[in-house]
Every structure is written in C-alpha cells, then in structure tokens.
C-alpha cells in the first residue's frame, strides 16, 4: 500500500559486480549497501522475471522512505544523539522468497510484540539500529530505548566474537583466571563505563 517495498532479483555476485562497475568498491562495513538495480525495473520487466520463476528478495525502497521520513533522529543512552539522513541507509532486504522476514524486520516486530523497553547491543550494531528505527517509524511502532555498549577486545585490539572463535568468559575462568583477571582482560574502562550507566 505504501509503495515502500519492491522485488529484487539480483544475486550477491551481481550486486558486488554492479558496485565494482560503478567504481564504488565496498568497504567491509559498506558491503550491504545495495545499488538499487531492481528499484528501477518497470512493471513489465518485474512481471517477466516473476514469470521466469526467478528467485527474489523484498527490499525496502529507502528513497520512498526518505521522502516520507526525512532525517532519522534518535538517542542512545551511552553514545548520545544520532541524526541520520534516511537516504544513505540503502535498500535493505526485508524478506526473501524462501524466508518470510529478515533479521531487521523480525527484530523490529519482536521488540514491539514483546513490549521491549530497553535494547542493549554492541556498538557495532548502530547501523542495524538505524534500520530498526526507520521500520518503527514507517510501521507506527513505539520505539524502545537503546544502549550500545563498547565491544570487548583481546590484547591485540581484535573484537572477541564467535566468528573469530574467541575464548569465552566461561573458558577463561575454567583456565584458572580469577574474576578480577577476567575483568582486567576485558578492560576495566569498558566495564566501569557500563557500570556507571547502570548506577
């Protein structure tokens, strides 16, 4: 009804090739910014692709959202105010042919249904929060309060994560480290920063 979504038939390799062709080589954090190829398809072109049974994803038309919303302004308890031009976000995937909702849409609706009042996540997910705030505004949903905490780094400054098979706090304690040692390793500055917000 709102004209905020469209079908995208591009594969990941086609998207990457289009970004490279346009001379906008993606940085690691920018890789998800879609160049809008299928946004420009005519109704007939879209119908032809559907008739060919091509797989597609549903994308948010961020240009249409930008016209409706303008700038996104929101506050994080720790990081302060963000003012983001909606148009820079990119046409994010909201659903796929085989998966009815994306992480972004699911998280936004789940927070609303469960009446979540505070969302706490790593500061590496601020961009995801921009997307969730946009979806909340478009869907007329009440927004929770957000707190983006500092990331925990190892001694080399690399973020601890499952993806890099970093040691867990449980495994550090099992190796004989005391609570104080683990806190030192995680960074007192980060821990104290979070504790000051809680108190």
Which ranges hold each PLM region?
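Active-site cores that bind ATP or allylic diphosphates and position pyrophosphate for catalysis
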Residues: 2, 7, 13-160, 168-173
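Conserved catalytic-core subdomain
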Residues: 155-199
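Proline- and acidic/polar-enriched loop/turn elements at helix boundaries
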Residues: 11-12, 148, 184, 198
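A generic structural-conservation signal
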Residues: 8-9, 145, 181, 195
